[in-house]
Amino acid sequence: MEILYQDNRILVCIKPSGVVSTDEPGGMPQRIRDCLGDAHACVRTVHRLDAAVAGVMVLARSRMAAELLSEQVRA
């Protein structure tokens, strides 16, 4: 798992192909928690990439950050 940037609000990483974006076993949020070594870390999906697609993903580290980032994606 390659993390490009992280702070207390967001985390930017490379999603490999073959991995789902959603929070389910083996999905990106779970992989980030595993990478951080914190099974209870708040990691929320802001946008999705198809499972077959590799690319950069932005994930939120709090509910408030997720809401703000989701608004920006919709705009």
Regions found by a protein language model. Give the residues of each.
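RNA pseudouridine synthases
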Residues: 1-75
